[in-house]
Amino acid sequence: MTEGVLPGLYLGNFIDAKDLDQLGRNKITHIISIHESPQPLLQDITYLRIPVADTPEVPIKKHFKECINFIHCCRLNGGNCLVHCFAGISRSTTIVTAYVMTVTGLGWRDVLEAIKATRPIANPNPGFRQQLEEFGWASSQKGARHRTSKTSGAQCPPMTSATCLLAARVALLSAALVREATGRTAQRCRLSPRAAAERLLGPPPHVAAGWSPDPKYQICLCFGEEDPGPTQHPKEQLIMADVQVQLRPGSSSCTLSASTERPDGSSTPGNPDGITHLQCSCLHPKRAASSSCTR
């Protein structure tokens, strides 16, 4: 069974990748196939094929950047990406964990705990866990150097945990609500998805009177991507857009105002004011937050 990890990002196995009913229901547009002999199976799907065996010594980390960019590009363009290996346990979970680490700033253990809340069988092998540890450490060091190099030049607001967790909280808790509302809470999971997400992300803010979450939600996580620049000098960093959340009184809808301004101060092509307004539903009202963070 395909499991939604974040809006636009799904985790499953080889059978899920061939299940036309599931693919259609989840509106899958992109698939990452990561196993020994990945092959494109459907004409209307964009594939990324990564031939990797599920053994601890395999350097799966070298595929992180390609996979992260593939997923990110898919989601930024409104698509839905399924990441699958043979059983949906180790290889695909490793890739999804690396992606969520990149766009939220969370450590791999926290991300894996959140994934297990919706897919209890998720379990990267020991070698892949070690590579996730190394990836997280290297990313944090790059982020620290990047922020230090910016202090004497352009503005670079410090990264705050509240900002980094904002999108993750909305996505994880909303996904958990949908799973509970549809009665699909995973068996053998000690905590419900919602309880596990709340334990990971902390208690939600006070819920205003009249707040009525709608399980049939549609959420877009708002991320900005740095200009890749000249081909000979590609930039590797992904940055989270400034996000402001405003609750609409008496409804479950809120407006996300996401600034897609680049680090150099320019705006995204085709969006001169640098602001994108998206409609979504979420579990809890959020206070407006505006900050930037780099990974």
Swiss-Prot record:
<protein>
    <recommendedName>
        <fullName>Dual specificity protein phosphatase 15</fullName>
        <ecNumber>3.1.3.16</ecNumber>
        <ecNumber>3.1.3.48</ecNumber>
    </recommendedName>
</protein>
<dbReference type="GO" id="GO:0016311">
    <property type="term" value="P:dephosphorylation"/>
</dbReference>
<keyword id="KW-0378">Hydrolase</keyword>
<keyword id="KW-0472">Membrane</keyword>
<dbReference type="InterPro" id="IPR020422">
    <property type="entry name" value="TYR_PHOSPHATASE_DUAL_dom"/>
</dbReference>
<dbReference type="GO" id="GO:0004725">
    <property type="term" value="F:protein tyrosine phosphatase activity"/>
</dbReference>
<dbReference type="GO" id="GO:0005829">
    <property type="term" value="C:cytosol"/>
</dbReference>
<dbReference type="InterPro" id="IPR000340">
    <property type="entry name" value="Dual-sp_phosphatase_cat-dom"/>
</dbReference>
<keyword id="KW-0449">Lipoprotein</keyword>
<feature type="domain" description="Tyrosine-protein phosphatase">
    <location>
        <begin position="1"/>
        <end position="141"/>
    </location>
</feature>
<dbReference type="GO" id="GO:0007165">
    <property type="term" value="P:signal transduction"/>
</dbReference>
<dbReference type="GO" id="GO:0048713">
    <property type="term" value="P:regulation of oligodendrocyte differentiation"/>
</dbReference>
<comment type="similarity">
    <text>Belongs to the protein-tyrosine phosphatase family. Non-receptor class dual specificity subfamily.</text>
</comment>
<feature type="region of interest" description="Disordered">
    <location>
        <begin position="251"/>
        <end position="272"/>
    </location>
</feature>
<dbReference type="GO" id="GO:0016791">
    <property type="term" value="F:phosphatase activity"/>
</dbReference>
<keyword id="KW-0963">Cytoplasm</keyword>
<dbReference type="InterPro" id="IPR029021">
    <property type="entry name" value="Prot-tyrosine_phosphatase-like"/>
</dbReference>
<dbReference type="GO" id="GO:0005886">
    <property type="term" value="C:plasma membrane"/>
</dbReference>
<keyword id="KW-0519">Myristate</keyword>
<dbReference type="GO" id="GO:0000122">
    <property type="term" value="P:negative regulation of transcription by RNA polymerase II"/>
</dbReference>
<keyword id="KW-1003">Cell membrane</keyword>
<feature type="compositionally biased region" description="Polar residues">
    <location>
        <begin position="251"/>
        <end position="270"/>
    </location>
</feature>
<dbReference type="GO" id="GO:0070374">
    <property type="term" value="P:positive regulation of ERK1 and ERK2 cascade"/>
</dbReference>
<dbReference type="InterPro" id="IPR008984">
    <property type="entry name" value="SMAD_FHA_dom_sf"/>
</dbReference>
<feature type="active site" description="Phosphocysteine intermediate">
    <location>
        <position position="85"/>
    </location>
</feature>
<keyword id="KW-0904">Protein phosphatase</keyword>
<dbReference type="Pfam" id="PF00782">
    <property type="entry name" value="DSPc"/>
</dbReference>
<dbReference type="InterPro" id="IPR000387">
    <property type="entry name" value="Tyr_Pase_dom"/>
</dbReference>
<dbReference type="InterPro" id="IPR016130">
    <property type="entry name" value="Tyr_Pase_AS"/>
</dbReference>
<dbReference type="GO" id="GO:0004722">
    <property type="term" value="F:protein serine/threonine phosphatase activity"/>
</dbReference>
<comment type="function">
    <text>May dephosphorylate MAPK13, ATF2, ERBB3, PDGFRB and SNX6.</text>
</comment>
<dbReference type="GO" id="GO:0008138">
    <property type="term" value="F:protein tyrosine/serine/threonine phosphatase activity"/>
</dbReference>
